[in-house]
Amino acid sequence: RKETYKSNDPINDRKSIDLRPAIVEQRSRIGDYEVDLVMGANHKGAILTFNDRATGYTLLGHLPCKGAIHTKEMIAKLITENQLTIHTITSDNGKEFSKHKELSEEFNLDYYFAHPYHSWERGSNENYNRLLRQYFPKGADLRFISEEELERVQNKLNNRPRKRFGYMSPKQVYLQAIKNQGNVNLLNNNQQNKKLPL
């Protein structure tokens, strides 16, 4: 499906990150996600990254093009197929996220938008995208990635030990949080919510 936009098209019913609950910033529960697109050469093809803020556990989806319908459908697919608990999603203001209201209604979640040019407000995504670029460098053609290749990279990064978790992997932290009813506080007490690099 081809999608077109006028350059001045607004994203309707946008909810600012300023209204996001404080608990999201605390990273004390699973289910608060950041979403972004890592673009391929000439903006043809993209990888959607869907990152749990508290644990760093991330799911990847391949988009041959970055239209809003394709983006919304991929997010819905990741949520449904992985049976995710979702409280909030935060993204930038790209037109590809203009179907946010449909996601909010379908999954009973709150969707927030960061301020323009404030990439640090989505720090989990930004840090993860830098790791992803080790496998898919800037300028790479992302139109024809296989599901097997994407899953291989997803598993590698989810199983890579991270400093912020005392060198546990995002997958380990995520699975422990599920056993702890979604609560991540017990895992992060020794970190005192310090903003350490991935």
Protein language model regions, located:
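Short, structured coil segments at secondary-structure junctions
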Residues: 106-107
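C-terminal domain-tail junction helix/linker
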Residues: 138-198
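Active-site beta-loop-alpha junctions of metal-dependent nucleic acid enzymes
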Residues: 42-43, 60-83
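RNase H-like two-metal-ion nuclease catalytic core shared by retroviral integrases
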Residues: 91-93, 98-101, 113-134, 143-155
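Short conserved beta-strand segments at catalytic cores or DNA/RNA-binding microdomains
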Residues: 38, 42-59, 64
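Mobile genetic element proteins and their domesticated derivatives, centered on retroelements
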Residues: 36, 50, 56, 75, ...
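Mobile-element integrase/transposase regions
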Residues: 1-47
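Short, surface-exposed connector motifs at secondary-structure boundaries
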Residues: 55-59, 81-87, 135-136
